[in-house]
A protein has these predicted regions:
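Conserved, well-ordered alpha-helix/loop/beta-strand core segments that scaffold catalytic motifs
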Residues: 1-68
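C-terminal regions of proteins
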Residues: 42-45, 52-105
């Protein structure tokens, strides 16, 4: 299912300001994109790009591109967000690799 509303940029700014405050207190905050069904990801690409760009502009980017977590539709159950067991294993492996790549292990 594609996103149907434009991202609420003011809400993203509120979120990124909170992240910055946490970081100022020495708290490590890591943003990983959610899992997407590939069809939904492709239909929502402009929205996802807008969110990603806003996060980057606020210096609170995702650790990896959201496309990394766009999985074939067959790895999802009844929604574009509910991964199957195989999809969960794949995402877990990617999360571990992504955290390792930034020195979190």
């Amino acid at each position: 299912m594609p996103l149907t509303e434009r991202p609420k940029v003011d809400q993203i700014h509120i979120f990124t300001n909170e992240v910055k405050q946490l970081r100022e207190r020495g708290i490590k905050v890591i943003l990983l994109p959610p899992s997407y069904a590939l069809t939904s990801f492709n239909m929502s690409k402009s929205y996802i790009d807008e969110i990603t760009s806003t996060l980057e502009g606020d210096s609170v980017p995702f650790v990896v591109s959201p496309s990394r977590y766009a999985f074939t539709d067959t790895l999802f159950w009844n929604t574009a967000y509910h991964l199957s067991a195989e999809g969960r294993r794949l995402r877990t492996d990617l999360v571990i690799a992504d955290l390792d790549s930034i020195g979190i292990n």
